[in-house]
A protein has these predicted regions:
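Iron-sulfur-associated redox domains of electron-transfer enzymes in respiratory
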Residues: 64-374
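Iron-sulfur cluster-binding cysteine motifs and their immediate structural context
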Residues: 2-16, 20-44, 49, 53-68, ...
Length: 374
């Protein structure tokens, strides 16, 4: 897959009128991408990795993540909500994934597709790559686009350590469109895929086409923009549709540690929070983690459950509570690992053949050295 030729697009934006020049963002930025000029913050685009740390620490809400509006749904004949695993964590007293997915259909979507399904396919492929000794160790997960760009900006010598697999988001978007074409008979262009996103970095990955010339995702909608509307509908649904097909470890990708557990690597570590990630990358660069097989690195505190595109309450993110909701889903789901999931097995039977096959390489693998990360 070849990289795109257009300039790198950033989702993190600054409202200069709201900025008070307090320097909170400058102090916390992990790549020194912020300066204070004439009493206002300025974002240096060539350094910004869209991790959302500045959004998290700004007391004046001057930093925002640019996403799309639900009004975009009207541009398509058939609309699919591509649901990130972290979305389930928003509803602390609801561990029924089917209920949440059914409610999305009442917001104007015609179908739903769980990114956790794609995550489990990537987990299975990762396990085979690790077992076959085909990865430079320690292998670093490619799931977090903020971490991938961080490596490109600050640790370019580690790019070859990034696992050369597509993101679950892009893989799931492709599968969702394929299934919709078969179901509706519509042309692919008339089907809209909308990612319900927990963070700024994934919006950037879509708009910049990090992995490919053009993302399979047509629009990115922040979780906080649909949360209240959807929460109001949950209590009015008596019979949820059986829509969830993901195993619980696919859903647990939203927690720090879930992806690493799914990899089944014997020597693995999980790190979350961008400053902690930097420390681990420095350790890898200094060859202090040579005995580790696999590193799951997530920019947001607590993992995607702590992403900056999610609802806030009283100024504090509820990453821990969201994570506990995801753990509860894990405990209640009898299907955990990829090899136990019928939808993952069907995907391999129908499209990928078997792990590490020629067909799997063609559809699941990528060359991370050619990604558009700068």
């Amino acid at each position: 897959m070849e990289p795109i030729a257009q300039p790198y697009w950033h989702s993190v934006t600054l409202d200069r009128d709201a900025c008070r020049g307090c320097t909170n963002c400058l102090k916390q930025c992990p790549t020194q991408a912020i300066r204070i000029q004439s009493g206002k913050a300025k974002i240096l685009k060539e350094r910004c990795i869209d991790c959302g740390e500045c959004i998290r620490v700004c007391p004046y809400h001057a930093k925002q993540a640019a996403t799309d509006s639900l009004s975009m749904l009207s541009d398509y004949d058939f609309r699919i909500a591509l649901v990130a695993p972290a979305f389930y964590g928003q509803f602390s007293k609801t561990e029924d994934c089917d209920l949440i997915l059914t409610a999305l259909l009442q917001l104007g979507f015609d179908d739903v597709f769980e990114v956790a399904r794609g995550a489990q396919e990537i987990s299975l492929e990762t396990r085979r790559l690790l077992a076959g000794g085909e990865l430079m160790k320690p292998a670093i997960s490619s799931a977090c686009p903020a971490v991938s760009r961080l490596i490109a900006v600050r640790f370019p010598n580690l790019i070859h350590h990034i696992v050369p697999l597509r993101s679950p988001m892009e893989l799931s978007a492709e599968a969702a469109r394929r299934e919709a074409v078969q179901k509706t008979g519509l042309s692919p262009q008339r089907i809209g895929i909308f990612f319900i996103s927990p963070c700024a970095a994934k919006a950037t990955a879509v708009k910049s086409g990090t992995e490919t010339k053009k993302s399979q995702v047509d629009g990115v909608i922040a979780m906080k923009d649909v949360y209240l509307r959807l929460a109001q509908k949950l209590s009015h649904i008596d019979r949820p549709l059986p829509l969830s097909k993901a195993g619980s470890l696919g859903t647990r990708w939203a927690n720090s540690g879930g992806e690493a557990e799914g990899s089944k690597a014997a020597r693995r570590i999980s790190v979350d929070g961008i400053h902690n990630v930097i420390q681990v990358l420095e350790d890898i660069e200094d060859d202090r983690l040579s005995d580790i097989e696999y590193v799951e690195a997530l920019a947001c505190p607590g993992g995607c459950a702590g992403g900056g595109g999610q609802p806030f309450q009283e100024g504090m993110e509820l990453a821990g509570e969201r994570g506990e909701t995801l753990y509860e889903i894990d405990r209640n789901n009898p299907v955990r690992f990829s090899h136990e999931n019928a939808s993952v097995q069907k995907a391999y039977d129908d499209f990928f053949d078997k792990p590490l096959s020629h067909r799997a390489h063609e559809l699941l693998h990528t060359d991370q050295t050619k990604w558009s990360l700068r």
